[in-house]
């Protein structure tokens, strides 16, 4: 269950970035391709994929993620009374679930992680629109025969 919300304390922010230039149009239709990170205590936590069976979580300076993403907005998710060490413990625990080789564009992406971390810290979920495109694509993926779809993640080596 999420930590108790407080009106005072350390703010938790959800930082949202555009992944594509077409987001400026898609956003107004309730869609878009976004990267998200969670900022707390001057650190931004996010999730990305790699080919190893270890945590895919990484920490950056706030508003300075890797890659060519463009900052869109920050949403204050609430304030917490947790210590930096307690936050680190929560992030480390999530790192056991969010392994780099488990990244999947539709079902286990940076937005899923950000939602989970926001909930663990504040008891509030991230806005649904940040991952709406992945959710819609997941439904389409389930409706189409597998041979019609290319794999979204590379197959594991034998």
Would you name each region that the model predicts?
Residues 102-122:
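Active-site nucleophilic cysteine motif
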Residues 135-139:
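Post-kinase regulatory C-tail/linker adjacent to protein kinase catalytic domains
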Residues 1-108, 140-158:
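Non-catalytic ligand/cofactor/substrate-binding and regulatory segments of enzyme domains
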Residues 121-133:
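Short conserved catalytic/interaction loops centered on acidic-Pro-aromatic/His motifs
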Residues 111, 128-131, 145:
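Alpha-helical catalytic/interaction cores of small GTPase-regulatory modules
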């Amino acid at each position: 269950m999420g930590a108790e919300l407080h009106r005072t304390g350390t703010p938790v922010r959800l930082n949202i970035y555009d992944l594509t230039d077409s987001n400026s149009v898609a956003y107004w239709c309730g869609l878009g391709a976004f990267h998200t990170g969670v900022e707390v205590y001057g650190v931004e936590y996010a999730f990305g994929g790699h080919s190893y069976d270890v945590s895919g979580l990484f920490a950056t300076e706030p508003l300075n993620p890797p890659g060519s993403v463009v900052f869109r907005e920050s949403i204050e998710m609430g304030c917490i009374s947790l210590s930096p060490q307690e936050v680190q413990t929560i992030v480390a625990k999530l790192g056991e679930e969010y392994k780099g080789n488990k990244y999947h564009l539709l079902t286990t992406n940076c937005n899923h992680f950000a939602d989970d971390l926001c909930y663990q810290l504040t008891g509030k979920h991230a806005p649904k629109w940040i991952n709406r495109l992945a959710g819609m694509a997941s439904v389409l993926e389930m409706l189409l025969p597998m041979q019609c779809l290319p794999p979204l993640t590379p197959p594991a080596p034998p």
